Amino acid sequence: MAQSDLYGVLGVAKDASQDEIKKAYRKLSKKYHPDLNKAPDAAEKFKEVQDAYDVLGDEQKRANYDQSGSADGAQGGFGGFGGGQQGGFGGFGGGGGFDDIFNQFFGGGGGQRNPNAPRPGRDLQYQMDLTFEEAIFGKKTKIKYNREAQCHTCGGNGAKPGTSPVTCHQCGGSGYVTTETNTPLGRMRSQQPCPVCHGTGQEIKEKCPTCGGSGHEEERHEVEVTIPAGVDDGQQMRLQGQGEAGQNGGGYGDLFIIFKVQPSKDFRRDGTEIYFDQDISFVQATLGDDVTVKTVHGDVKLKVPAGTQGGTTFRLRGKGAPRLRGNGNGDEHVTIKVVTPKNLNKGQRDALRDFAKASGESVTGSGKGNLFNKMRDKFNEN
């Protein structure tokens, strides 16, 4: 299937969000569900919608699909979320290779998966905004998000309470039907998903009134999250079992929280190291002073030696961000910025001229500022 077809099947743009994709999938799957739509091509369209969502509804598969331009390519790919999902480059849709293709036509069918095997649910992503300080010190918070959960009425089997799914009468529970075709090479056999059970191997005679036989229902889920001290912008945390419900008794997927850390107006951060600019006067820089410096852990005193030049950096050990795996904190690096006064009164200018004279310097500048300052100084002289 060409790249544009998958998005076209769901009727969404290529830059559609996951919410838009999921909304389109639910609408179309309900529209073409064979139990609700008796049109001859409903089952085929239902399968197309399902196949499209299997790829576009998974962030990693979608990324691989967008890059490779084929649905088969999207079924492999590298595992996402820091190795949480192992993967590789898929061949023939991630199956067993050429032998499966050969057996499909000549009767082997050896590459088909058990349709009744448990399948884990989808993983979800959640972006969490943090202030600079919250990322440094961590916090506990509760988050809410929508997810597909196991139906509380039927327990996930899709059947009306008091009933159970039964083995599909068409495929005998295999999930596939075999067709035979006469060709110049002889009589060939191929397997296709069962049109009755749609590959599940089971029929639901009386559907659950809550979920309509899907076994899932949407819920507003709440979970408490403990954010460790020292997380950084773009990092993510995995919460096992907080994703969406699986199929055939498969477990829930995982939730991946991606942190978005707001910048600080005072500090800059690089990993566990924090950087801060400290203003001092030229008198403090010349004579030295004990300066109060801001850190994320509170104010501290920094001894600035006499003769300190602008751009000099001091290290405050242990005043940086915590290391995620323990072993204390990083450091804060304080860069000195010497501030030159702009508006001097007459006494200050005279003192500086005396200083320049004592230093053997010849200074031609007047040291006077704008007209307002000149008038103010003249008034003070009187």
Swiss-Prot record:
Binds 2 Zn(2+) ions per monomer. Zn(2+) 2 binds at residues 168, 171, 194, 197. Pfam families: DnaJ, DnaJ_C, DnaJ_CXXCXGXG. Its cofactor is Zn(2+). InterPro entries: DnaJ, DnaJ_C, DnaJ_domain, DnaJ_domain_CS, HSP40/DnaJ_pept-bd, HSP_DnaJ_Cys-rich_dom, HSP_DnaJ_Cys-rich_dom_sf, J_dom_sf. Its main location: cytoplasm. Residues 5-69 form the J domain. Keywords: Chaperone, Cytoplasm, DNA replication, Metal-binding, Repeat, Stress response, Zinc, Zinc-finger. It is found in: Cytoplasm. Gene3D superfamilies: DnaJ domain, Heat shock protein DnaJ, cysteine-rich domain, Urease metallochaperone UreE, N-terminal domain. Residues 104-123, 358-382 are annotated as: Disordered. CDD domains: DnaJ (cd06257), DnaJ_C (cd10747). Signal peptide: none annotated. One of its GO terms (biological process) is protein refolding. CXXCXGXG motif repeats lie at residues 151-158, 168-175, 194-201, 208-215. A zinc finger (CR-type) spans 138-220. Coiled coil: none annotated. Participates actively in the response to hyperosmotic and heat shock by preventing the aggregation of stress-denatured proteins and by disaggregating proteins, also in an autonomous, DnaK-independent fashion. Unfolded proteins bind initially to DnaJ; upon interaction with the DnaJ-bound protein, DnaK hydrolyzes its bound ATP, resulting in the formation of a stable complex. GrpE releases ADP from DnaK; ATP binding to DnaK triggers the release of the substrate protein, thus completing the reaction cycle. Homodimer. Belongs to the DnaJ family. This is Chaperone protein DnaJ. The lineage of its organism: Bacteria, Bacillati, Bacillota, Bacilli, Lactobacillales.
